[in-house]
């Protein structure tokens, strides 16, 4: 595997084990089948809002923690998510998740979605996505588009569970931009961009 560059290293995202709560490195994570027997824990309420200047600093930290950088490849382009509008999810006055987006044509593009590992599996990402959908409806946009990578099985699961449909696979899109093949979720090589859509 080629040497990782500073700009496009392996995704440093940290996941939390749903059974024991231990933090797991992205590349070391595994997919497994589990039932819903775990008791549901009531979580503190989530407030989702447009990011303020103070929120943007926290959002940048979340994106850096999740992606290792704020410049990412999405929709076939290299994008700087720091320059995009963002929604933040706040729990106990602390940002626990962030969603960067752009408006283009009749669609809202979800460019990046990051959740603090402490709040994974607590609904933060779902609240952010629901707010993005409300924003698109208020703006009378007809659809939301999402771009992710072939290795990102958690994202593919999440978006499809929320009504998004696979619409396009762009082979080697990420590899062509990064000029390398990096290991992604569970060691799956990151190569392709996968696009999903939800019509409103």
Model-predicted segments: where are they?
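Short cysteine-rich clusters marking metal-coordination/redox-active sites
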Residues: 17-20, 34-35
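Cysteine-rich micro-motifs
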Residues: 30-41
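Conserved active-site tyrosine of GNAT-family acetyltransferases
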Residues: 158-159, 164
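Acetyl-CoA-dependent GNAT
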Residues: 50-119, 126-131, 170, 199
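Conserved beta-strand-loop-alpha-helix junction that forms the acyl-donor binding cleft
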Residues: 146-155, 167, 171-177
